[in-house]
Amino acid sequence: MNKLTKNMSLTAVLVALNVVLGTFISIPLGVIRAAPMQHLINVLGAVLTGPWVIVQALISSTIRILMGTGTVFSYPGSIIGAALAYVLYHYSKKLPLAAVGEVIGTGVIGALSIYPLMLILDLDTNIYMVMALAFLVSSIFGAGVSYFILLQLEKRGLLKRL
């Protein structure tokens, strides 16, 4: 199987996993739904598919919004987190940096980016800190679990085969 076909196939599988698991594991917090599965899948995708993880994040977020298990706030967190996880892993080839990239991208940069979105949507900005904290906690949890999964795959020699 050539690399393009492999990456497209893995991206489709990760989107499906994200949407299905996100249906069961979603934490409603006011106007957002914390999605630790999105963060888990983002880190896996950054390592397994490279830049395709950004496509996966966009498609997953769109489907989750259409299904009602995500909100418009899914975009800034998931896409920025996926992109930073990919960039840090791509240039370092270190699994911890993929997880750190997701946490910084979603939990910090993504959380900062929702404030202007809240202003545009005329939402109460008094709840911003709660939302930002939810982004951070959700991304730490999801990235942590994915890091553990990737370590186990690497330990068993399976990561190189994927």
Where are these regions (language model features)?
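Loop-helix junctions at membrane interfaces
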Residues: 1-162
